[in-house]
Every structure is written in C-alpha cells, then in structure tokens.
Amino acid sequence: MSKRRYLTGKEVQAMMQAVCYGATGARDYCLILLAYRHGMRISELLDLHYQDLDLNEGRINIRRLKNGFSTVHPLRFDEREAVERWTQERANWKGADRTDAIFISRRGSRLSRQQAYRIIRDAGIEAGTVTQTHPHMLRHACGYELAERGADTRLIQDYLGHRNIRHTVRYTASNAARFAGLWERNNLINEKLKREEV
C-alpha cells in the first residue's frame, strides 16, 4: 500500500476542532472548512474576496486556476455560520478595512501561502493526522469524500473544476465502495433471465 496522500473526513473534522479555540480560531476554522468543502487550491482560497460570497443566497463563486472551470457552489449552513463568525472577528483586526480578502493576517494583509501552509500543517499535527498535512491534501480529501458519497466522476470533475477528467478519475478509481453489490445486482439479472427462459 502506498502512503496516503489525502485526509479523511474525520481527520479534517479533528483539524477544525483543533484550531477553533486558538487566538485565530474563527479564521483558521473557516479556512480549513472552505478549503475542504469546495476542494480549493491554496491560491484559490487565498484569492477569495467578500464579493465572491452571497451569504443571503448561500453561494460562493470559485475562480479556478490552472485553466480549470470556475464554478458557483452552494454554501451550506455551517459554512455560512463559519464565515459570519470569522467576519465579525475580522472586523476587530488591525487593518482589516484595507482589503476585501476574506483571509487576512493579524497585520491586516492578505494571508500568505506560507501562513496558510503553517496553519494547515499545525492543525494536522494538533489533530494527530496519520500523515504530514499540507493544503492540497484538503482538495484531495474533498474529491475522495465526494466519491465515497457516491458522486460520479463527471460531477466531481465539475465540482473541482478539472478541465481533464484524468485528474478526477483517481478519486473514483480507488473507491472500493463503488463495487459493493455489483455481484448481487448481476445475480438478480441472471435469475431474472433464467426465469424468462423457463
């Protein structure tokens, strides 16, 4: 077996719990939640601005990079709550009014890739994940979780903004659950055919 290169849903939950009580807990929780739920690359996440969100309608506009398809995703209730909680806290941060970027540092500038990497790595350590955690693992965790929930490859491709389905197949190809019941279904078909022959 090769070393796992993604996080499980339980590990992501543990990471969010690990960060939520720290000094920057509201920001870090929101950052991890949105990265995971929307399968965002770190650059896409850090490029999010308030104009990309419609909290009333429950939508988030994701501008995909690497020639990916930009998409509009629904924002679930817990995501809206996390954004609202972070936005309230963010308003008290020095220099927060200088930028529309959602994720900022304590100094009021847009959060850097290095800072986001450190937040996610440290959350993984605190949560006791089985592998060293980095931001792209949250994107992979999203793809694998969607496959586990039975989403088909094309839908996952659209959701993650992949232009080429080759990049998406990894999520469904390794999902053993998709084969569950395959023989049972085939046996039912065979039994039906036998009855029709009689």
UniProtKB/Swiss-Prot annotation:
GO CC term (a single one): Holliday junction resolvase complex
The answer to whether the entry has keyword Plastid is no
- Give the GO biological process terms: chromosome segregation; DNA integration; DNA recombination; resolution of DNA recombination intermediates
What's the short name of a Pfam family annotated to this entry? Phage_integrase
Highest taxon listed in the record's lineage:
Bacteria
A GO molecular function assigned to this protein is:
tyrosine-based site-specific recombinase activity
Q: Where is the signal peptide?
A: none
Instruction: Give residue ranges for domain Tyr recombinase.
Output: 2-184
Q: Where is the active site?
A: 41, 66, 136, 139, 162, 171 (o-(3'-phospho-dna)-tyrosine intermediate)
UniProt KW keywords: DNA integration, DNA recombination, Fimbrium biogenesis, Transcription, Transcription regulation
Record's function text: FimE is one of the 2 regulatory proteins which control the phase variation of type 1 fimbriae in E.coli. These proteins mediate the periodic inversion of a 300bp DNA segment that harbors the promoter for the fimbrial structural gene, fimA. FimE switches fimA off.
Family as reported in the entry's similarity comment: Belongs to the 'phage' integrase family.
Name of the protein in question: Type 1 fimbriae regulatory protein FimE
